Amino acid sequence: MHKLIIHGGTPLKGSINISGAKNAVLPIMAASILTDKLHITNVPKLTDVSTMKDLLRSHGADIEIIEHQDEFELIIDTKNINNFTADYEIVRKMRASIWVLGPLLTKYGKAKVSLPGGCAIGARQVDLHIAVLKAMGAEIEIEDGYINASSKGRLKGPHFVFDKVSVGATINAILAAVLAEGETVLFNCGREPEIVDLCNCLITMGADIAGIGTSEITIKGKDSLNKASYKVLSDRIEAGTYMFAAAITKGDVKICGIDYHIVENIALKLIETGIKVVPINNGVQVTYEGKLNSVDLETNPYPGFATDLQAQFMSLMTLSSGVSMITENIFENRFMHVPELCRMGADIVVRGNKAVVRGVEMLKGAEVMASDLRASVSLILAGLSTNSKTVLHRIYHLDRGFQDLEKKLSNCGADIKRV
């Protein structure tokens, strides 16, 4: 099994190009089921993308892959979909597999999807997915670990209020509603840029969607959608991760290929800590200026601070000049990186959904183990900050969400190798 060897202590200097957003491309790939052909560009080279390709092919899709140096193009032909079951063997690898449920159900009137897998960071129940589809008229039962869904005729657009903000359920609801009969109005929706990107793709396909980027989305169902081409937006989580990498290594890095407005909440939090962050043409520049203040943080649905960057921010706070309180409001059990950071000399105490981080002068290298995707990269950031050697095990998580991570960091001076 591969591992990463990191020799820290070098400030990162240079520029990093950001890849396409994983959390946007996966639902957009699922949206291909709604039409006959979808051409997607700026597709990142990630194992989760490969898993979604395998899933779509299992349903009967034909996928042409055009490989470029830094991205894929995908041409997904779904006119011959003939299998409506998403098997456990594929779905267990990735929670995003559940996003085929809405498209299969709304277009074909039936779908059978295994209960999903993915990172081990909490229950992340599918109740809201099921509730909104039932409100559209679907009949749904859970049997033997599968969601069995069917409808008599077309789904019908409801007025539906999500009990809590759910990115995943918002996506499934939108994917189902674009072909449902009548008007769907969804309240308390996720507002994430990746949801906006999905909606923009669907509009390119001919969907009628209003309220994009707000908590109230209105969709007028169409009889069918068109073939289309669409470029996926850049990954704000990847961008934020490298912004924190620049800060924790006392570096100076230009993050390129990202719209500043979708990373502005990250930039503002870094500025609070004393890091210099300025917008540049097609990106942002992050520069350490000699101090790192302790800052409290709460994760919240967008435009709040992303839970997917909580672990990276915690790594930064381990070296701050004071005490910070980090509150995780999205997922339970998302502090699994804490024991590993403590192995490296961090002073962190977890109390329920809160972590108290007391800054130390320096972390030290150690052998550590990744528990999930975002935890793994937080340990890399910690390793880069030390003046010694860190060995990171179970790095297969990284390839689910970060393209060419070692290469991008090495190009900025990091000593990091996969062995």
Swiss-Prot record:
E.C. number: 2.5.1.7
HAMAP family (alphabetical): MurA
Keywords noted in UniProt: Cell cycle, Cell division, Cell shape, Cell wall biogenesis/degradation, Cytoplasm, Peptidoglycan synthesis, Pyruvate, Transferase
Cystines in this chain: none
UniProt protein name: UDP-N-acetylglucosamine 1-carboxyvinyltransferase
GO biological process: cell division; cell wall organization; peptidoglycan biosynthetic process; regulation of cell shape; UDP-N-acetylgalactosamine biosynthetic process
Catalysed reactions, as listed in the record: phosphoenolpyruvate + UDP-N-acetyl-alpha-D-glucosamine = UDP-N-acetyl-3-O-(1-carboxyvinyl)-alpha-D-glucosamine + phosphate
Modified sites of kind 2-(S-cysteinyl)pyruvic acid O-phosphothioketal: 119
Gene Ontology CC annotation, any one: cytoplasm
GO terms assigned for molecular function: UDP-N-acetylglucosamine 1-carboxyvinyltransferase activity
Function field: Cell wall formation. Adds enolpyruvyl to UDP-N-acetylglucosamine.
Cell compartments where the protein resides: Cytoplasm
InterPro entries: Enolpyruvate_Tfrase_dom, Enolpyruvate_Tfrase_sf, MurA_subfamily, RNA3'P_cycl/enolpyr_Trfase_a/b, UDP_GlcNAc_COvinyl_MurA
Short name of any one Pfam family annotated for the protein: EPSP_synthase
